[in-house]
Amino acid sequence: MVALDPRINPFRPEIAANHLRGHVEAKRFVEGSRHQIIDPVTAVRRTPSHDARLDTEALLGERMTIYETTDEGWAWGQLETDGYVGWLSSNALGAVGATPTHKVTVPRAFAFAGPDIKLPPAVALPMGARVAVTRQDERFAVTALGWHIPEVYLAPVKMRQSDFVAVAERFVGTPYLWGGKTSLGLDCS
């Protein structure tokens, strides 16, 4: 058998994704179930412990296939966006909802309960968080969750930034964080 990288292939000695049958050894193989990240950002760890190494972070709206859950509130699976495999709090997972249509394009964006920036923010979203926009309300995009986000902070999910240097410059001064994917801490990869 070819050695596969367990950071991007969902297998451990006790469990593996069904599509890896014949490629890895495991006590059992499972199909997995799709879920969606419902927290703005959540840690994806090497082992099911809050003290475990951070391998990456999952952002709001990302989809993840879950292969195992524990009674202690952990879930083990693989992110669809970058393929990373790891453990995260099962509280950060929800049912697959509306397909994200837009992503946050600034380092941080507030979402509000209504179309007014004077309202208390409902949540702060990191760059790359994905939301399903259902309509416009003045200068705000309204999401399937009922949040109002200033539309200037969003772009269609498939849109790519043409000037990656300008995007990187927005993060000058951001501290290094192994596995980090937000303006609170970034990994070099």
Residue ranges of predicted features:
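Active-site nucleophilic cysteine motif
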Residues: A168, T182-S189
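Extended, low-hydrophobicity, Ser/Thr/Pro/Gly-biased non-transmembrane segments
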Residues: I37-P40, R46-S49, E68
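Second-shell loop/turn segments in exported
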Residues: P175-T182
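Boundary regions of SH3-family modules and the immediately adjacent low-complexity/disordered segments
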Residues: M1-S33, S49, E62-T65, E72, ...
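Hydrophobic/basic alpha-helical segments enriched in Actinobacteria
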Residues: H35-I38, R53-L54, V133
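Short Pro/Gly-enriched beta-strand edge/turn motifs at strand-loop
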Residues: V44-P48, T56-L60
